[in-house]
């Protein structure tokens, strides 16, 4: 992806200097943990221990050794200093601190640090708020979807949770519904216009006051004609509303719900794989490693009581099993991190696409509502033009002229009566 996807990376501890006074057995090297405590790693067998190994194979330099065959990672790096994962996908073990951390910590230098640095919520890794620095937003100052919907939210309708991505999908579908309802609203507006035009046309044919005469009669006739003209204007307005506003609103993204459903399934499948498959495998492997380490520790303690070839053989066998359990855990964690990285990248890509779609939807509706107001202004202008002839004729109404015309047509005589003579 072009966008730099900043995920919390881990910094390796500086390796400790090997002892200047004591020569370690072949393959063993010493390092310092992040807390400053020295531990030892066999680079051949990936064996890790807090106690300085002796030159005798299988026996530590001091009683009560607590060794771990887990190829330990400290802050996302192997003890040898090489990254446990590529820097862009490095993550810590996904667990909250538990009461058993003391046992595991004594066997694995970096395990306790891992628990303090991260926290697991619904199978997703997050930096621990008490120990990790604040992350830089992917798109600062933009309030982008890709920055604010990583966690789950309590479902107000029930006792469960709703994924952040699900909230974004709900907004998209709600936007589609709002768009549909706006289209229905315009449809109702069109019906009103059509009914209004029909009534205007019908009224224009009414014969009331049809016998009005003179200039006033002409003005009255124009009033009735203007109703027919206005009816035509409103019919054209309703037709344009249908073709230029209602229809585009209704047909915009006809397959949107189907597309959103596919999108939902894609992200949900990735999240399901992360939780039900990868995280479950990590927890299973972690439990198995704990059991193997306990078994190894128990056999090591037995060695303190009774030294025998059989006990040493049991320790070697337990160490091999512990090593295998450690390898299995690292493999499961690596697969988990890969799955989480895939989910992370798809979340960023998809949320940015949803963001783009929302901007596009809002802009589309805005443009068509602007078209509505433009058509409305045009309708007002046309309506004004229908009454202009009426205004002109009304200005020409002349009661005196009308009287003259009427008298000329209907006069009965201009000889006035006179007094009767005797």
UniProtKB/Swiss-Prot annotation:
Please indicate which superkingdom the organism of origin belongs to: Eukaryota
- Sequence segments annotated as region (Disordered): 1-117
Question: Which PANTHER family does the entry link to?
Answer: GROWTH ARREST-SPECIFIC PROTEIN 7 (PTHR23065:SF57), PROLINE-SERINE-THREONINE PHOSPHATASE INTERACTING PROTEIN 1 (PTHR23065)
Q: SUPFAM superfamilies in the record, alphabetically?
A: BAR/IMD domain-like (SSF103657), WW domain (SSF51045)
Q: Any keyword ATP-binding?
A: no
Alphabetically ordered keywords of this record: Coiled coil, Cytoplasm, Developmental protein, Differentiation, Neurogenesis, Phosphoprotein
Which Gene Ontology CC terms are recorded? actin filament; clathrin-coated pit; clathrin-coated vesicle; cytoplasm; ruffle
Main localization of the protein? cytoplasm
Q: Extract the Pfam families matched here.
A: FCH, WW, WW_FCH_linker
- Keyword Nucleotidyltransferase recorded: no
Coiled coil regions in record: 254-329
Please give the function described in this protein's UniProt entry. Answer: May play a role in promoting maturation and morphological differentiation of cerebellar neurons.
> What is its subcellular localisation?
Cytoplasm
- Limits of the F-BAR domain: 141-402
Full protein name = Growth arrest-specific protein 7
Task: List the GO molecular function terms.
Answer: actin filament binding
Here the segments flagged for biased composition (Low complexity) are 53-65
Which InterPro entries did the record assign? Answer: AH/BAR_dom_sf (IPR027267), F_BAR (IPR031160), FCH_dom (IPR001060), GAS7_F-BAR (IPR037957), WW_dom (IPR001202), WW_dom_sf (IPR036020)
Q: Where is the composition biased (Polar residues)?
A: 41-52, 95-117
GO BP terms: actin filament bundle assembly; actin filament polymerization; clathrin coat assembly; clathrin-dependent endocytosis; neuron differentiation; neuron projection morphogenesis; regulation of cell shape
Q: Which residues carry this modification: Phosphoserine?
A: 62, 108
Question: Which species does the entry assign this protein to?
Answer: Rattus norvegicus (Rat)
